[in-house]
UniProtKB/Swiss-Prot annotation:
Principal location: cytoplasm
Binding site for [4Fe-4S] cluster 1: C64, C69, C75, S304
Residue numbers binding [4Fe-4S] cluster 2: C90, C94, C97
CDD domains registered for this protein in UniProt: Radical_SAM
Reactions performed catalytically: [[Fe-S] cluster scaffold protein carrying a second [4Fe-4S](2+) cluster] + N(6)-octanoyl-L-lysyl-[protein] + 2 oxidized [2Fe-2S]-[ferredoxin] + 2 S-adenosyl-L-methionine + 4 H(+) = [[Fe-S] cluster scaffold protein] + N(6)-[(R)-dihydrolipoyl]-L-lysyl-[protein] + 4 Fe(3+) + 2 hydrogen sulfide + 2 5'-deoxyadenosine + 2 L-methionine + 2 reduced [2Fe-2S]-[ferredoxin]
Ranges where the Radical SAM core domain occurs: 76-293
InterPro entries: Aldolase_TIM, Elp3/MiaA/NifB-like_rSAM, LIAS_N, Lipoyl_synth, rSAM
Pfam families hit by this protein: LIAS_N (PF16881), Radical_SAM (PF04055)
Record-given protein name: Lipoyl synthase
């Protein structure tokens, strides 16, 4: 296959997206059949409908909808939502992720105010702000995160804000300096998988770099809980998961999420196993023994799953 030409603003998906990563992705013939314990209820409620209508009104897209999150109904009904800023084109090519790759367009200077107005209109209580990777920006997008936080707090003073940030590769010092000046209520960065699988699952990322990012933020802003998460089912062993959890605690990470990886398409990394709910429960027990303030562990758990409740518990224990 000829390498696709990457033009600004054009998203590469599927086979085109993973064409240049160091590990060849062989398309699966069929997507694996999900076990009985992975069942998603269609979210239906007046509050869910209200939030969806307002999202359309403000021309916003929540990660909850874009990723077809199984917990959308629970979160929307509870006044929680996750928004992606800085566009929908990522500079990385992670083959587990369904976000398009390419050369992003310039940042929208009006986005912080527009997002703040929309969140105030939605009457949300807890908001998670995440983003694509922006390796094209000198600060990795940290200032844009800070601008969004500031504008949202101006219009919604009582709101709780969690940021799920990229790894700020090569830009950690400047990014953390900006973040510490306008810190969120929870600082989240996902390790995603065990170090042995980084080359295949997170090309361009570094396991120790991500751990250091979380630890250094905690050292700079000790009163803000730190959080990270893993997807299970990419080929890791239970022993490797436990080892990563130990390393997280050594780097002062307060909160943990563990969920099942679900293959977005035939051109993404294949699911190697479906982890049983009992195993997820065991991981949670081990996590609390290690000293995590809160552990959300289950097949349908995602990074922002019950994020408001997690944050409340973690802050009470700091």
């Amino acid at each position: 296959m000829a390498r696709p030409k990457v033009e600004a603003g054009v998203k590469l998906r599927g086979a085109e997206k993973v064409a240049r990563i160091p590990v060849k992705i062989i398309p699966t013939v069929d997507l694996p059949k999900k076990p009985d314990w992975i069942r998603v209820r269609i979210p239906v409620s007046p509050e869910v409908d209200r939030i969806k209508q307002l999202l359309r009104k403000h021309k916003l897209h929540s990660v909850c909808e874009e990723a077809s999150c199984p917990n959308l109904g629970e979160c929307f009904s509870g006044g929680t939502a996750t928004f992606m800023i800085m566009g929908d084109i990522c500079t990385r090519r992670c083959p587990f992720c369904d976000v398009g790759h390419g050369r992003p367009k310039a940042l929208d200077a009006d986005e912080p105010k527009s997002l703040a107005i929309a969140i105030a209109d939605l009457r949300l209580k807890y908001v998670v702000i995440t983003s694509v990777d922006r390796d094209d920006l000198r600060d990795g997008g940290a200032q844009h995160f800070a601008d969004c936080i500031r504008e949202i707090r101006l219009l919604s003073p009582g709101i709780q804000l969690e940021t799920l940030v990229p790894d700020y590769r090569g830009r950690m010092d400047v990014a953390l300096e900006i973040t510490a000046a306008e810190p969120p209520d929870v600082f989240n960065h996902n390790l995603e998988t065990v170090p042995r699988l980084y080359k295949a699952a997170r090309p361009g990322s570094d396991y120790q770099w991500s751990l250091t990012l979380l630890q250094r933020f905690k050292q700079m802003v000790p009163h803000v809980p730190t959080k990270s998460g893993l997807m299970l089912g990419l080929g890791e062993t239970d022993e490797e998961v436990i080892e990563v959890m130990k390393r997280m605690r050594e780097h002062d990470i307060d909160m943990l999420t563990l969920g099942q990886y679900l293959q977005p398409s035939r051109n993404h990394l294949a699911v190697q196993r479906f982890v049983h709910p009992d195993t997820f429960a065991w991981f949670a027990e081990e996590g609390y023994k290690m000293g995590f303030k809160n552990v959300a562990s289950g097949p349908l758990v995602r990074s922002s799953y019950h994020a408001d409740e997690q944050a409340k518990i973690a802050k009470a224990m700091l």
